[in-house]
Regions:
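FAD-binding core of FAD-dependent oxidoreductases
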Residues: 1-6, 207-213
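C-terminal substrate-recognition/cap domain of FAD-linked oxidoreductases
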Residues: 2-5, 11, 15-195, 199, ...
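Short, local alpha-helical segments
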Residues: 175-182, 211-219
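Activity-critical C-terminal alpha-helical subdomain
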Residues: 214-253
């Protein structure tokens, strides 16, 4: 854990792209530019629509910089130059798309619980992949999950956003919303979860990016985890938590 001074300076913008491919290239260049934005989240057109941040025709890049030391105008200006080089536009909006998305994001757990009570099947899954493999991976995941949603629920909505971007690659985060059948929602969810997880591993992604490693992911986590790392984790668990208090039976037996 690292304690940092509270930011005194902030600079932010929302950039829209007519094409998701252009937005992805802009996010990649930003991640590899050395500018180190504090926030660089890409909302695909479906994610923008479902969150109310857009009308579903454009992708939106939520961009922000923070510092406790200096003004950030030059950093933001250079980031916007990069976005403009990939046909990104800062458009005049009645409301700030970033603020709209942030509000929906914070309400997400409450909305999810409400959706479930109304009979909706809701699922999210996050992964990570290198930039050079992203497009094949993304198209494969979309195809597999859409087919599973059609088979399990008759159809639904599927969206994607980049939760994080790194010089090596993005961390795509997918959301699924589909109609449930009373009494069969869990089976429908299982079918979608299985298809998504199998596709992620088959296409070279990681079963989870940095959180949500737990019982739901265990079959794929164990398949992906190197045996040596598993033994090292088991040994550390026995040494540091001999009573098995912390997450018993989750990452290790």
């Amino acid at each position: 854990m690292r304690v940092q001074p509270r930011p005194r300076y902030r600079a932010a913008a929302s950039v829209s792209f007519a094409g998701f491919a252009d937005a992805v290239q802009a996010a990649r260049e930003l991640a590899q530019s050395g500018l180190h934005p504090a926030n660089c989240r890409l909302l695909g057109p479906e994610e923008a629509l479902l969150s109310g941040s857009g009308d579903g025709s454009r992708s939106i890049l939520v961009l922000g910089f923070e510092s406790a030391d200096h003004e950030l105008g030059p950093w933001l200006a250079r980031a916007l130059e990069i976005c403009a080089g990939h046909r990104g536009e800062v458009r005049d909006e009645d409301s700030d798309p970033a603020a709209v998305w942030r509000a929906v994001f914070l309400r997400g757990p409450h909305l999810r619980d409400g959706f479930v009570r109304l009979g909706l099947v809701a699922e999210t899954f996050e992964t990570a992949i290198t930039w050079d493999r992203f497009w094949e991976f993304h198209q494969g995941v979309l195809a597999a999950v859409r087919q599973a949603v059609r088979q399990a629920c008759g159809g639904g909505a599927l969206s994607c956003r980049f939760a994080y971007v790194y010089p090596d690659g993005p961390a795509p985060y997918y959301s699924v919303y589909a109609p449930g059948r009373p009494g069969q929602e869990l089976e429908q969810w299982d079918q979608i979860k299985l298809a998504a997880s199998e596709a992620i591993l088959a296409l070279g992604g990681t079963i989870t990016h940095h959180h949500a490693v737990g019982r739901d992911h265990m079959p794929w986590y164990r398949a992906q985890r190197p045996a040596l790392f598993g033994r090292a984790l088991d040994a550390a668990k026995r040494a540091l938590d001999p009573a098995g208090i912390m997450n018993p039976g989750v990452l290790t037996p």
